[in-house]
Amino acid sequence: MRLPGVAKSTNREWSLQQRAIFEAFRSAPGHVLVRARAGTGKTTTILEALQYAPESKILLGAFNKQIADELQTRVNDPRVQAKTLHALGMGYIRAQVDDVRVDANNRAWDLVKDVADDAPQAIKIALKNLHTKVRELNPWAETTSDVERIAIAYDLVPDEAELRGKWTEGTYYETVLTILEHAADEVEVIDFADMIFLPLRRGWAWPVADLVVVDEAQDMTGPQLEIALRACRKDGRIVIVGDDRQAIYGFRGAASDGLNRLKARLEAVELGLTTTYRCGKAIVEVARALVPDFQAAPTAPEGTVRTAPLSAWMEAQPGDFVLSRVNAPLMGVALGLIRQGKRARIRGRDIGKGLVELVNKLKLSRLEDLDGALEQWSRREIARLSKKDQAVARTRIAQIMDNVDTLLTLAETVASVAELQRKLETLFSDEGASESVVMCSTIHRAKGLEAGRVWVLEDTLKGGNLEEENLRYVAVTRAKDELVLVTKNYVAPEGGEQ
């Protein structure tokens, strides 16, 4: 039974799985986990399900503001408020602090100057970046070990050359803890990180909804999920929606087993949404080797899957995706496509910015010095990381080598350091899927997107653990009609290449 006055969807035939979800929203006595696979109509299903919920105040938590705004325009129900969890946190802060002001540009820097104004400039910059990241990922940080783990994972350990006088790694981490205490006290001016940090650190998060629905839960950090759970009234319900097999942001603080841990904590009933309306049947079969419950819609086209030699990516056309686990191979692909006269970009403007900062850090006078400078820098960084927790350091070492390979690949096509920097600024873009450009992207950056034809650089993928398998699943399920697996191990079928 629908609620009185709620608009009824028309001309839509819902699946058995979708109807089970609607019934759970209507009558399930406790919390619910909806495990929704790639391209299964998750958003449409949840918006329809909300119409069955009897609660009078519903919070729909979204991953980012763009998604929250889109959801709010589609809800058309006064009981439902779609917002990011940062916006939820901001509401908690406004309730506690009169005339609070957001200053995203100066807040983090001002906190450093208040606590450590006598620090060398390089240390101040490092402190600013690290205390911001700790506020985002561990509002409850109490020990230097809590801080160090985040510093290593995000390349926020200062260079040995920057640690002088009283500044050791130990004092650096202790200072971050002092800044956190100061940030919790000075709350009249805040930034984005404070919107999660302050409600949790100060205990300001309280129940505001009878039903809390968290979308894309597998991508949320622990603190984001915690603030969502605290928003639910004691006798209310929580619905967690996500795909554990799209959990690929472990480096960003989203745990790969986060959905299962939430299910256990909430003692939630689980429902599945496993039929994809995106991928052709042949593509689904590839994905099923990784995720057995993944299914093609009965009306899905057959789709095409083929393997191809390494040079095949040169056939990519505007509108296609070329996906890799890491950035370095994408540089060669993008440059090769541009030489053919095709528009190509590498997704991730911030990646290009980071590489420009690395080039500046190397202080090169000649392009010929790049190779040696990168070798010295990478050896120094890896040697330092070898003394740290290896589970954390391993990811950072891989990033270091990817940065080195990316810069060396681009350097082969330019004549000066200045030209290298200019190309980095123009090649990397936040442009999304477009019919006018070949989008070269890491798998992480392509999550949530789709294309008719997707080229996957197979040899960049690793095996051996769940998150690596998840990356392959995400890559494969970006393709709607054609999936091309590019590999050096390609063997042409008898009678010639396919």
Predicted regions and their residues:
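ATPase/helicase motor core of nucleic-acid motors
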Residues: 264-265, 314-320, 329-425
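P-loop NTPase Walker
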Residues: 2-99
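Conserved P-loop NTPase-based nucleic-acid remodeling module centered on helicase motor cores
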Residues: 57, 65-135, 338-341, 345-355
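Conserved helicase motor core of SF1/SF2 NTP-dependent helicases
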Residues: 35-47, 52, 63-66, 86, ...
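Catalytic glutamate of the conserved HExxH
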Residues: 216-219, 478-479
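C-terminal accessory regions
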Residues: 401-498
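Interdomain motor-coupling "hinge/lid" segment immediately C-terminal to the ATP-binding subdomain
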Residues: 96-185, 262-263, 269-313, 319, ...
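Accessory N-terminal region flanking or inserted into the helicase ATPase core
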Residues: 2-24, 31-33, 45, 121-213, ...
